[in-house]
């Protein structure tokens, strides 16, 4: 070793033979640690094999069952709390809000069409236009709209016929001419069967402008009070099972919009390619939300539910509609195929009762009874919040139809799974995985 003395400092300069190359140091480290780790590898493999041999798959299933059903309970609580927080809040008029272009795609007429459409002519909003879209000029609904235009001449309204063929989604094709000439910053899509409260457009616009990045506002689907078994059945479905998921999903910022009554910022939608960009999808509402979210925009819900008020509800039409939605979800999100049939009351009751019985030897019948009581109580509370007034039917009728709907739900899923083709209006659609329309056949 050579010493170099500079003033009071002594620097030790190692000889060349003492300086080891970096690669040599790595080799030494490897030779040091490899034997240390290599002796544990057989032990690790042996331990893993023993765990796999000794694992109790029933215990794993039971633990998964408790976690899964607990998540469903959590959604119940979140949906109810968010409904109490968000629904039926008063909205003050605000003349600084931007104008709204309301697009109404219409096919056919029923006994409630005039009443439903009139609520848009009389809406309490300072600046809006009504854009009615018809596939054919001889549609029976044309005369209904013409009579309302004559009754309310001061309302800015326009009718379009024939649509514009830009893709396989007939609703997008029908609305395209109206979208092209819409003159306001906010675009609202509203189905013909929606009954609108006088301040609902105001509320949706206020919600939209409450946050700079808000670009999509929807109304939670519900139903106006109507007579008839099928109408009550539909109302209970939308007031319980559907409302719970919709409210909880929006609270947790899941993408779950429905297009029956929705409002978007035209500028944000144009960034995504406008209506034309979604003409290849049948569930355009879902993909509106997905694309807007991918660009950093937020979505929210109005304080007023969307009041569906079709006069032509039958059990067959309702079943076909729900079945069509199940098929859409299966095509768009195939990962939920195994989860969807288990999320209703009675399938989840069997899961949690088996799980708790296996893990803690808790009586299965007791668990099922407590589960059903919790489920129906929470559903009833959610529906009361959606209704926001006295129910139009008795508690006994609610109980009987609720039970029937819950028993009916697995059968709807089975029907949807057996025939993935989707019949809508006068067309049959076949979807590819991901939700894109693969083919369309007229019937």
Curated annotation (Swiss-Prot):
Location within or outside the cell: Membrane
Annotated S-S bridges: none
What gene name does this entry carry? cgt-2
Quote the EC number: 2.4.1.80
Q: Describe tissue expression.
A: Expressed mostly in intestine and vulva.
InterPro entries reported for this sequence: Ceramide_glucosylTrfase, Nucleotide-diphossugar_trans
Motif (D2) positions are: 191
Motif location ((Q/R)XXRW)?
A: 321-325
Query: What GO CC annotations are associated with the protein?
Result: membrane
The UniProt similarity line reads: Belongs to the glycosyltransferase 2 family.
**Motif (D3) on chain:** 285
Q: What is known of its domains?
A: The D1, D2, D3, (Q/R)XXRW motif is a critical part of the GCS active site, involved in catalysis and UDP-sugar binding.
Protein name as it appears in the record:
Ceramide glucosyltransferase 2
This chain's source organism reads Caenorhabditis elegans
What reactions does this protein catalyze?
Answer: an N-acylsphing-4-enine + UDP-alpha-D-glucose = a beta-D-glucosyl-(1<->1')-N-acylsphing-4-enine + UDP + H(+); an N-acyl-15-methylhexadecasphing-4-enine + UDP-alpha-D-glucose = an N-acyl-1-beta-D-glucosyl-15-methylhexadecasphing-4-enine + UDP + H(+)
Q: Which GO terms describe its biological process?
A: glucosylceramide biosynthetic process
